[in-house]
Regions:
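Glycine-rich phosphate-binding loop and adjacent beta-alpha segment
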Residues: 227-306, 339-343
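Mid-domain Rossmann-like dinucleotide-binding core that forms the NAD(H)/NADP(H) cofactor-binding site
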Residues: 125-203
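C-terminal capping/lid region of NAD(P)-dependent oxidoreductase domains
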Residues: 3-6, 303-312, 320-343
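Short glycine-centered segments of the SAM/dcSAM-binding site in methyltransferase folds
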Residues: 93, 150, 174, 240-241, ...
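Glycine-rich beta-strand-centered segment in the early N-terminal region that forms part
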Residues: 30-48, 56-100
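NAD(P)H dinucleotide-binding glycine-rich loop of Rossmann-like/cofactor-binding domains
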Residues: 72-79, 86-155
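Short amphipathic alpha-helix with an adjacent loop that forms part of the alpha/beta core around
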Residues: 204-214
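Short, glycine/polar-rich helix-capping loops at beta-to-alpha or helix-loop-helix junctions
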Residues: 101-102, 180-190, 262-267
């Protein structure tokens, strides 16, 4: 083992609004030594996801916040570099939750084996990981799409949205994506197979959406919030379903958005149109749905029915800048940090 220190990125202070590089700090500590029953893991890939922004706040949401000076949380794909646990062998690849650091100890609980030579190990953080599972559960169990439905997907080229749209097409939906910029919209249509994709930065976005969804919207997969939802709301059909996955446009907000209070309009639409709007946290669904997810998506990948794009950034030290860019929509595909080269 040539590396002698463990790099860690910790939460230096809590952001006020949008995160800045100064909210993070790179530290170096001794590489831990496994005790009996433990394994030493070395991360190779780190997943960066929007939910991490909420964990930087002081208040608890659905999970405890990251404490100041603690390692930032995150899913990882690691290799076992030393094992004192008979269930794991040196060199094995595992999915773990070791966060923004090079090395971590584990007693084996919660580790998911990928074998010795997985073809695409980083896929376990994306299309076959939490983002893919989020899309699968949110659309199929909450959105309940039917053939012929109009499905609108916010953040259509992101890790979750790109999967939602493609699964929707497999289920016979007419799929409309919403993304930022012409390049992403072109990718959604030409590569992912969306029927249409609209640029939410266009001045006439709301008018374009209304013209495109001339028969209304049956399922809206919400990843963004803000003005995109404002444009979607009046177009929702009677009995529409809205899986509420995320609100990335609001994660950095420090106050209520400007403008009139639209809560009564929202509640009125939900009442009159009998709209089903349901938030969900993916960790609640692993026991009942994960096996089917892996089986279905693995088959779709093998058959070429699902396309997947990674935005790979080299170097753990670049994680803060990449994460800040993620919240600004600068990534194109699933954002993954390659922290180290495989052993």
């Amino acid at each position: 083992m040539t590396q002698t220190l463990n790099r860690q990125i910790v939460l230096a202070n809590r952001p006020k609004g949008s995160p800045v590089p100064e909210n993070f700090r790179l530290e170096q500590t001794a590489i831990p030594t496994p005790s009996e029953g433990e394994v030493l893991l070395r991360s190779v890939y780190l997943s960066l996801d929007p939910y991490m922004r909420g964990r930087m706040n002081e208040g608890k949401s659905y999970a405890d916040p990251v404490e100041l000076n603690d390692v930032m949380v995150g899913g990882t794909v690691c290799q076992v570099v030393e094992s004192k646990n008979s269930d794991f062998q040196t060199g094995e690849w595992v999915v773990a939750y070791t966060g923004w650091q090079d090395y971590a100890l584990s007693d084996g609980e919660g580790l998911f084996k990928l074998g010795n030579e997985p073809t695409h190990p980083s896929y376990a953080l994306g299309v076959l990981g939490m983002p893919g599972f989020t899309a699968y559960v949110g659309l199929l169990e909450i959105g309940q799409p039917q053939a012929g439905d109009t499905l609108v997907v916010a953040a259509a080229t992101g890790a979750v949205g790109s999967m939602v749209g493609q699964i929707g097409k497999l289920k016979g939906c007419h799929v409309i994506g919403v993304a930022g910029g012409a390049e992403k919209c072109q990718y959604a249509k030409e590569t992912l197979g969306f029927d249409e994709c609209l640029d939410h930065t266009a001045d006439d976005f709301a008018e374009q959406l209304a013209a495109t969804c001339d028969k209304g919207i049956d399922v809206y997969f919400e990843n963004v919030g803000g003005k995109v939802f404002d444009a979607v709301l009046p177009l929702l059909n009677v009995g529409a379903r809205v899986p509420l996955c995320g609100l990335i446009s609001q994660y950095n907000a420090t106050a209520l958005p400007e403008g009139p209070d639209r809560m009564s309009m929202l509640m009125g639409n939900i009442l009159v149109k009998r709209i089903k709007m349901q938030g969900f946290i993916i960790f609640d669904h692993y026991e009942q749905s994960y096996t089917n997810f892996v089986k279905d998506v693995s088959q779709w990948l093998a058959e070429g029915k699902i396309h997947y794009r990674e935005h790979l950034v080299e170097g753990l030290e670049n994680a803060p800048e990449a994460f800040i860019g993620l919240l600004q929509g600068k990534n194109f595909g699933k954002l993954v940090i390659q922290t180290n080269q495989p052993v």
